[in-house]
Amino acid sequence: MVYVTGDLHGDYSRFKRPEMKKLRAGDILLVCGDFGFIWDNSKQEQTVLKKLSEKKYTIAFVDGCHENFDLLQQYRLVRWRGGVARLIAPNIFHLQRGEIYTIENQKYFAFGGGHSQDYEYRRDTGNWWRQEQPTHDEIRRAIRNLNRNQATVDYIITHEPPASLKDCLGVDVQQRLEIHSFFEDIIKECDYKKWFFGKCHMDRFIPMKFYAVFQDVLPVTDERD
C-alpha cells in the first residue's frame, strides 16, 4: 500500500508516532519534501539513515527547500518504478523533478523544490542551496514527460502548492515563482485524481483534489479511487 506524509526535517521521532505504525513490509511511504536526513553527513546522521534503511517498507521523497543538495547529488541515479531516482539506500529513494513513476499500477508525477521563506538568513549562514529552486529546464523536462503520458497521471506529489492553493491557505501569498505558474498550468491541462503537497506544515483537505500534508500519514488511495 502507498502512504504519503509531509515534511520530516530530519526528525527521526516522526517515525515513532502512532501514525507510522500502520506501515507494513512492502508498503511505500512518499514524503512531500524537506526529508532532511541528508544534511551534514555526521556520524549521528549516518546512524539515523541506517535505522531508516532497516525499515521493512520503502521511503521515497521529493526534495523540498531545506535539503543539502550538494550531498543529495552525490548519490547515484537509478531506474526506479519506470522513472529516475537517486538511490540513498536499498529502500530509500530521492524522486527526481518531473519524473513519472508507476507504483501499484498507478502513475505518480513527482516535482520537488521550491523557495525558502528563511532564504536570507540561511544564505548568510551558509546553509542555503540554489538548487532548491526548480530551473526552467527541469520544468520543460516535466512538461515533456507529462505530454508523453497524454497529460494524465493518477497522483501528484510536490513540495510547493500551486499558487491558487497558497491564496486559499493564506501562506506565502506574495511569493510567485515559475514553479507556481507551472503548477497552475497542470491544474488546467492535466487529468489527475489527487495532489499532495508539503511545505505549509498543516494537514488539510482542500476540495476536491488537494491535500496539504504534514504529520498525517494518509493512504493515497481510497474507495473512490
Explain the meaning of each model-derived region:
Residues M1-Y3, E99-A110, Y155, P207-Y211:
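Beta-strand-turn-beta hairpins that frame and shape the catalytic cleft
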Residues G83, P90, I103-L177:
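Active-site-proximal loop/helix segment associated with metal-binding centers of metalloenzymes
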Residues K21-L23, I103-N105, N145-T152, Y211-V213, ...:
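A structural signal for the main folded, soluble domain(s) of proteins
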Residues V4, I28-C32, Y155-H159, F196:
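Structural motif
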Residues T58-V62, V84-P90, A163-D225:
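Conserved beta-sheet core of the metallophosphoesterase superfamily
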Residues L8-H9, F35-G36, C65-N68, G114-H115, ...:
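Catalytic metal-binding/acid-base residues of hydrolase active sites
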